[in-house]
Structures are given as C-alpha cells and as structure tokens.
From Swiss-Prot:
InterPro entries hit by this protein: AAA+_ATPase, ABC_transporter-like_ATP-bd, ABC_transporter-like_CS, FeS-cluster_ATPase_SufC, P-loop_NTPase
Sections of the chain in a coiled coil: none
Listed GO MF terms: ATP binding; ATP hydrolysis activity
Family according to the record: Belongs to the ABC transporter superfamily. Ycf16 family.
PANTHER family: ABC TRANSPORTER I FAMILY MEMBER 6, CHLOROPLASTIC (PTHR43204:SF1)
A GO CC term assigned to this protein in UniProt: chloroplast
Gene that this sequence comes from: ycf16
Keywords, sorted A to Z: ATP-binding, Chloroplast, Nucleotide-binding, Plastid, Transport
Protein location: Plastid, Chloroplast
Protein's recorded name: Probable ATP-dependent transporter ycf16
Length: 254
C-alpha cells in the first residue's frame, strides 16, 4: 500500500521583515515517520517551523506547504491546528492563575467541539487523562498546579507532550525538546517520544545537538545551513556531525 505524505513542502521560500530566511526548501514526511532537523544557530531551523505553523511575522514568497494534500500555505495558525498541526515551543510559557487541569480539558474539549461532540466534565476528562499521565510519567499533582509555573525543564517538556497527545495531531513539531535538560530528563523525554513513535505518531523534531539521537533514532536527518537543507540522510549523518562538527557540512557543500 502506498504511504501517504503527512507533510509536503515544495520549493519554499520565506521572508521576515522583507529578509529572505528560507531558500528553496523541499521536504516530505510520510505517515508514521520521524524526521529530525539539525543545524547551527541561525541556520533557519526555527524559521522553518514557524512558517509551517503559520507565524504571522513570516511570509511565504514562493512555494507550497501541504498537510495530507491540503494546501496550507496561506492558512491561519488556527486553520493549521484544526488540520492537525501541533507546534511545541522550545521554551513553554508559564501562566499564573490558569490551572493545568482546566487548561488541558479546554484543549481536549476544543478538539471535541470541532468533531461535533459535547464537552467532557472534569470527572469524564480525568478518565481520559489518567492513562496519558502514566504514558508521560506525570502524576496527578501536576493537574492542580498553575500552567508550567515552577515546573522544571523536564516537567515543562512532558507537560507540552501531554498537550500534544490530547490534541491528537497528524503532525507534531517539537522545537528542541532536549533544550536545557540534564541527562536524566533527556532520557525521560526520549522515552516518551519513543512511546509515541510506537503509536505511529508522525513527528518533526528540531535539535541543535546530537545527544537526543543517542536515544531517539529518526527515519531521516536533515541538516540546515543559511536557510537551506544542505544534507539529508539517516542517523549516521548525525553521528558524523557529532564527530566532525558543522564546519564539515560547510566544507562539503562548498
């Protein structure tokens, strides 16, 4: 059976404040695949994610973006979200006065509303949420805290992945989920990501370092530099990068 492409990017060029930041990007992620994008600071990794998510500061000047054959190039962020695009932030924000449980239930009920289903009350939602808490190694005390307030880096990342699971996205985009984590938190987050891969979640992950790939083995690795994808391969590409550094990529593409 032919695999469906969840994300297709064709000849994409984009700018911010009239400055072109992405140049002729081509990318295809098929059903159940996990792709990783790496690159030095300023290479265009985060810009690509923001363009996929529909950030209003970024303008597509050429090319197309498709999610399961639906053209989202000019779609609003809300429309992209409704089509199943989830973007996890590198630094999840803290919101004082917003209970974590209420926020998560609002996320889930919004998804149900789009499907024409009634809202779940707190007890009904807890039945849905409990096994997901186990999946991401979070206990129910997290539910009674303000959103991300006082959370460690690892707790913030797990909480965001929890939001992702509740959203049931077609494509989950994670911006440096390993950022600021110690080795134990990195292992914990990697374990959660691998559990989701086993459940056939399609993911695009941005990372600056190779450490995450010691625990998560992607289907493809893409290297970006100066707003372009300059190399594509499997995880051995990341291993070479760790050994030789980004200067090796610059030399090999010159």
């Amino acid at each position: 059976m032919k695999e469906t492409s969840v994300l297709t990017i064709q000849n994409l060029k984009a700018c911010v404040n009239e400055f072109e930041v992405l140049h002729n990007i081509n990318l295809q992620i098929k059903t159940n695949e996990t792709h990783v994008i790496m690159g030095p600071n300023g290479s265009g990794k985060s810009s690509l994610l923001k363009v996929i998510a529909g950030h209003p500061s970024y303008k597509v000047i050429e090319g197309k973006i498709f999610v399961e054959n639906i053209d989202i190039t000019q779609a609003t962020p809300e429309e992209r979200s409704n089509l199943g695009v989830f973007l996890g932030f590198q630094y999840p924000i803290e919101i004082t006065g917003v209970n974590n449980a209420d926020f998560l239930r609002a996320v889930y009920n919004q998804k149900r509303k789009k499907q024409g289903l009634k809202d779940l009350d707190p007890l009904e939602f807890l039945e849905i949420l409990s096994p997901i808490l186990d999946l991401v190694s979070m206990d129910q005390t997290f539910l009674h805290r303000n959103l991300n307030e006082g959370f460690s880096g690892g707790e913030k990342k797990r909480n965001e992945i929890l939001q992702m699971i509740l959203s049931k996205p077609r494509l989950a985009i994670l911006d440096e989920p390993d950022s600021g984590l110690d080795i134990d938190a990195l292992r914990s987050i990697s374990e959660v990501i691998n559990k989701l891969r086993n459940q056939k979640q399609c993911m695009l992950i941005i990372t600056h370092y190779q450490n995450l790939l010691d625990y998560v083995i992607p289907d493809k690795v893409h290297i970006m530099d100066h707003g372009k994808i300059v190399e594509t391969g499997d995880v051995t590409l990341a291993i070479q990068l760790k050994r030789k550094g980004y200067k090796w990529i610059k030399q090999s593409t010159n």
